[in-house]
Amino acid sequence: MPRIAQAFARARAENRAAFVAYLCAGDPDFDTSLAACRALLASGVDLLELGVPFSDPLADGLTNQLAAQRALESGMTAARVFELVRRIREFSEAPIVFYTY
């Protein structure tokens, strides 16, 4: 069974909602994002959603717009988002999805 389906099945079996956490990858920088992901996953997050920063996120609210701006200013790119996932995979097999335009 795929990781995402397993996460929801496990939550359902435990009679609870799945805990899905969102972070803008690279906000405020790569290392802080990695540390935040590690902390969230250690805290029991079932599924991690990583926002891929975009230069013109008009559909997002101000908070996500500013997060994307900080991430881009710190050098985050699509390639670095995949590097972040590779680093997360060193300590977690939790499902990861992307939020992108």
Placement of each model-derived feature along the sequence:
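Short secondary-structure boundary/capping segments within folded domains
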Residues: 10-14, 28-30, 38-42
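Short, well-ordered coil/turn segments that N-cap beta-strands
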Residues: 14-19, 44-46, 90-96
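Glycine/small-residue-rich loop that forms an oxyanion/phosphate-binding "nest" at active or ligand-binding sites
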Residues: 62-101
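N-terminal amphipathic alpha-helix/helix-capping segment at the start of soluble metabolic enzymes
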Residues: 1-20, 86
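Glycine-rich, proline-tolerant flexible connector loops at the mouths of alpha/beta enzymes
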Residues: 27-30, 45-77
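Conserved, mostly hydrophobic/aromatic
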Residues: 21, 40, 48-51
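Active-site mouth loops of central-metabolism enzymes
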Residues: 19-35, 95-101
